[in-house]
């Protein structure tokens, strides 16, 4: 099934090119619309560690949480012809934002459901996050008051975090949660980056009644390629972890509502929910203290979900 869907994505440009050869392209001002908006980004991203030698069970998980990071978002769309549109969109954070990180380990194989080690880092920053999206739409219905179309595109997103200070509860070799303490305030503990690359397919549409308009978009990908980089800065455990995961699932739902203040200008609000589901992938580590490295197949997991709310202006030229 995924192979068939990927075939649709790859052959869409060919089909559109063939169709375009029978139509006349007209680059006129009223073929273009653009929008810009401001809003917030909230969500959580997760990294996991699995042990293949213990049946692939999860032994570690780090949850990076962020709330209400300010973002700016923009898009431009060009109607090549009544049936075909191309577009570009993207957003970026306007600065760093405070967050939170929790790191838990399950090292006791005889009691895998109970964590043995935990550290909490309330002094965590979302350093930056951004995304770009290139897409093409084919309109099945295209009337003055409503549109419905299929879409295909390519999207990339990035996230960067730094956790500082914090507290910990560890288990010694002889005990259980018996080592309690804290890290120096402001000292870097862990730095983490994620990147997601994906082709996708989707469905988009809108409906207008007088000066009010509702719209929505659904996107899906089964071909997400994600990667991450985890830097442990502890001088006694200076380790870099890098992981790659392929063919993850991605889901996105966006809904917007707007009002035309002039025939060409619309103010609107929008909410978008996005998720990349967890899947196992390969990981490597490099120990800077010992100059040693290791590699593990199916030893990592990467996941991300977020919610974006924006308010902005759309203008048709």
From Swiss-Prot:
Membrane topology per the entry is:
Multi-pass membrane protein
Please indicate if the UniProt record lists Signal as a keyword. yes
One GO MF term, please? endopeptidase activity
Relay the activity regulation note: Inhibited by zinc.
Cite the EC number: 3.4.23.49
Query: What is the similarity comment for this entry?
Result: Belongs to the peptidase A26 family.
Protein name (database record): Protease 7
Can you name the source organism?
A: Escherichia coli (strain K12)
Classification lineage: Bacteria, Pseudomonadati, Pseudomonadota, Gammaproteobacteria, Enterobacterales
């Amino acid at each position: 099934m995924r192979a068939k869907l990927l075939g649709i994505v790859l052959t869409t440009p060919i089909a559109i090119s063939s169709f375009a050869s029978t139509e006349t392209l007209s680059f006129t001002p009223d073929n273009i619309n653009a929008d810009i908006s401001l809003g917030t980004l909230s969500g959580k991203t997760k990294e996991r560690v699995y042990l293949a030698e213990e049946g692939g069970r999860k032994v570690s998980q780090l949850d990076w949480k962020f709330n209400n990071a300010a973002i700016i978002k923009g898009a431009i769309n060009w109607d090549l012809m009544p049936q075909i549109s191309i577009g570009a969109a993207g957003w970026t954070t306007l600065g760093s934002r405070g967050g939170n990180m929790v790191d838990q380990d399950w090292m006791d194989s005889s009691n895998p459901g109970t964590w043995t080690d935990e550290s909490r880092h309330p002094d965590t920053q979302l350093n930056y996050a951004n995304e770009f999206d290139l897409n093409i739409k084919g309109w099945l219905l295209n009337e003055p008051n409503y549109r419905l179309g299929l879409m295909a595109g390519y999207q990339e997103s990035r996230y960067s975090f730094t956790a500082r200070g914090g507290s910990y509860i560890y288990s010694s070799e002889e005990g259980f949660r018996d080592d309690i303490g804290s890290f120096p305030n402001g000292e870097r503990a862990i730095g983490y980056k994620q990147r997601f690359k994906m082709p996708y397919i989707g469905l988009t549409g809108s409906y207008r009644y007088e000066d009010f308009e509702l719209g929505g978009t659904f996107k899906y990908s089964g071909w997400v390629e994600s990667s991450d980089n985890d830097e442990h800065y502890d001088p006694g455990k200076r380790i870099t972890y890098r992981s790659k995961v392929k063919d993850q699932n991605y889901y996105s739902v966006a809904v917007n509502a707007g009002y035309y203040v002039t025939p060409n200008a619309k103010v609107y609000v929008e909410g978008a929910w996005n998720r990349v589901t967890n899947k196992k992938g390969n990981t490597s580590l490099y120990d800077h203290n010992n100059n040693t490295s290791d590699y593990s197949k199916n030893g990592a997991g990467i996941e991300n979900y977020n919610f974006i709310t924006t308010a902005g202006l759309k203008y048709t030229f």
